[in-house]
Amino acid sequence: MRGSEASGPGALLGAASTLTTSVIRNPTSIPTSSAPIPSTDAGLVAKNVEHVLMSLTAQNDGGLVSVSGNSSGSTGKGILIGVLSAFGSAVVAVIVLAIFFFFKYTRRGRIMLDRIGRPGEFDDEQAFAREEAEALEVMDDLSRSEYMRAKAFVEAYPPESMQTDISLSQFLAIQEKGVSAWEFQPELEIANCFVEGRTEIEFYDSECSVQTNLPVPKQNDVYYWEAKIYDKPENTLVSVGMTTKPYPLFRLPGFHKYSVAYSSTGHRRHNQPFASTPYGPPLSQGDVIGVGYRPRSGTIFFTRNGKKLEDVVHAAKTQNFFPTVGANGPCTVHVNFGQMGFVFIEANVKKWGLAPMTGSLAPPPPYGSEQGSILLESGRESAAQISQRVYQEAGYARTNSTVRIPPSRSPGPVRSPTDISLAQLAHIPSHEDVGEGSSQANTIDGEQTPLLNTNDLDDQVPPPEYSSPDGSRRGSDIAGDLPRQGSPPIPSYDAAVGNHSGDTARSDSEP
């Protein structure tokens, strides 16, 4: 077909005639009977087919030709539209996230430490004041007074109003002691608990909390600690979490600003004294609660019996948090800062404790060990010297009690302690200076150092029971007589017997 027939309705007619011709020329493709078809019937069929094609052409207005010609173009347009839609959705998502983080980290006067849309949080002072007014209306007198007392404390001592950074002395203590540098210190004025062994806390009948002496460090990526509940009655509420200093310790953690806690009821509190938020399963006796802190992102999370729960606090990077445990009734809680293995496997493997188990400070030497210790060696030598001196003094006292060395009343020549001389000494007048070789000096020195060999004297000196006859001065000296001065003379046996018999006869003769 050429000319106007290619683009007009004639094209369809031509196509129809071609189709009709092909049908007529191929009669074998259609099952027919052996009887010949009349020519009038074939013309009627051709007219019917032409009529149907013309009606379709009129209804679709040339749609057959247009569809076959534009099929490839419409496919490309569909792909382009899909790609542009995907890129547009991504751009919209990026813009929304940018706006969210911009308002989250740059807006002042807004506390947004948790995710948006979570109930139980306050993000500005007006909303908190509205919640406070609603809560005070339904509080009882005791709860209202406790809240007002805590509010007055927070106003007088705002959070982070005192220096809580780790000082140089505290850092050195951590280096020396390791994780043993952390311990719980109860407030003496309001303490209703007792701390034993630095980390074992026993609470009594009233509400109170206890903080550690040191904050959580910020050098590592993650710090983690755990608390195990012992002896918890059903009506006792236990809260484990983190707080800043100063904090009203007569209240549980999580009730006031810059504090968070996981309560034994299964709720959590974050800067919220009025309403708590469901968080996890309730806690009972034997459960272990873990608290993790990521200083770089300011995130705080909890674990229960070794299973991590969702994050609670975000962007708390500037505060110094102290591990805190509180209760309103009798219970016992043991805390593990890393001195033992954690129940949370990840923290146990990655060593997320507050400090190493052992510091650089060496332990004291064990008693009874001989590891070349100077202290133990000197003590052993001192004991030997003391025993030898006691033995020498005992021997000298025994010898000095039996052997009497007559001192000289006149001074002699100067000689060494080992020089023994028994020669007669010249008489020197008493008004002259006796000098170093005087008998007085020798007498004083003689009390400490014997001048004679006691081993030779033991064979020559009589036994201690021997007594010299009366009137004999042998073996006696002034030094030996001095101890007996002031005591009456000892009478002999005969004199004592005679006096006794005389007294008896005299008493018998008297009426």
UniProtKB/Swiss-Prot annotation:
Disulfide bridge partners, by residue number: none
Limits of the B30.2/SPRY domain: 146-342
Name its GO BP terms in alphabetical order.
Answer: protein transport
Q: Where are the transmembrane segments?
A: 83-103
SMART domains the UniProt entry points to: SPRY
- Where is it chiefly localized? membrane
GO CC field = endosome membrane; vacuolar membrane
Report whether Cell inner membrane shows up as a keyword of the record. no
- Any ranges marked Cytoplasmic in the topology annotation, and which? 1-82
Protein origin, superkingdom: Eukaryota
Q: Where is the composition biased (Polar residues)?
A: 437-455
Q: Does the keyword Membrane apply?
A: yes
- Chain intervals for the UniProt region annotation (Disordered): 432-511
Q: Can you tell me which family this protein belongs to?
A: Belongs to the SSH4 family.
Q: Which PROSITE patterns does the UniProt entry name for this protein?
A: B302_SPRY
Protein name, please? Protein ssh4
Protein keywords:
Endosome, Glycoprotein, Membrane, Protein transport, Signal-anchor, Transmembrane, Transmembrane helix, Transport, Vacuole
- Give the glycosylated residues: N400, N499
Lumenal domain ranges by topology: 104-511
Cell location: Vacuole membrane; Endosome membrane
The function of this protein is: Components of the endosome-vacuole trafficking pathway that regulates nutrient transport. May be involved in processes which determine whether plasma membrane proteins are degraded or routed to the plasma membrane.
Report membrane topology. Single-pass type II membrane protein
Q: Which PANTHER family match?
A: RAN BINDING PROTEIN 9-RELATED (PTHR12864)
Q: Please name the InterPro entries in this protein's record.
A: B30.2/SPRY, B30.2/SPRY_sf, ConA-like_dom_sf, SPRY_dom, SPRY_Ssh4-like, Ubq-SigPath_Reg
